[in-house]
Regions:
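Short acidic-aromatic active-site loops that bind/stabilize oxyanions
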Residues: 1-6, 82
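C-terminal cap/loop subdomain of S1 sulfatases and analogous C-terminal strand-loop tails that border
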Residues: 57-84, 98-107, 112-154
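Histidine-centered active-site microenvironments of extracellular/periplasmic hydrolases
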Residues: 20-94
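Surface-exposed helix-capping loop/turn segments at secondary-structure junctions
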Residues: 14-27, 121-130
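Beta-strand elements within well-structured catalytic alpha/beta cores of enzymes
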Residues: 5-8, 12-15, 29-35, 90-92, ...
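Short glycine/proline-rich turn/loop motifs
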Residues: 1, 94-99
Length: 154
């Protein structure tokens, strides 16, 4: 599910209502991840804004690099720069009865950790072979010890 960035609370609410209607709300892990870092302003590629108002067709407006850093506070810099403000993305996980409410973990994970997490949650094993062809090893580690337990690192 991809959520519209303009109204994420409505889209997530719609999903939660549907899960409740299906009686699966207490049996579903929901993970919400945003994009990394704020836009850092105009780079080497410049697009002419013309005489348009911001938001009109043909307009192109971005915040400058100084405002971008405020959008990434408390982290330094912005998208395209390898400081935390440019590479970090928050992850919010929800699973009633499994994940403690209000807990904040300052550990590090990666998108490659999601597939091992889902396999672990489902009690499934990643196949070593598929249709007679050996598969590559699954990268990443399960995040369940962090999500369900008290661990900060896996």
């Amino acid at each position: 599910l991809v959520v519209d960035k303009e109204k994420p609370e409505e889209e997530i609410g719609r999903v939660l209502r549907k899960l409740k209607q299906m009686k699966q709300d207490k049996n579903t892990l929901i993970i919400f991840i945003s994009d990394n870092g704020a836009e850092g302003g105009r780079g080497a590629v410049s697009r002419s804004r013309g005489n348009y108002s911001v938001g009109d067709p043909g307009s192109y407006e971005v915040q400058n690099k100084y405002w971008s850093q405020t959008g990434n506070a408390p982290f330094r810099e912005y998208k395209g720069i390898c400081y935390e403000g440019g590479i970090s993305a928050p992850l919010i996980a929800w699973f009633p009865g499994k994940i403690k409410k209000g807990r904040i973990v300052k550990g590090v994970g990666h998108l490659i950790d999601l597939a091992p997490t889902f396999y672990d949650l489902a009690g499934a094993e990643y196949p070593t072979e598929y249709n007679g062809v050996k598969t590559n090893a699954l990268p990443g580690k399960s995040l369940l010890p962090i999500l369900f337990g008290g661990k900060e690192v896996v």
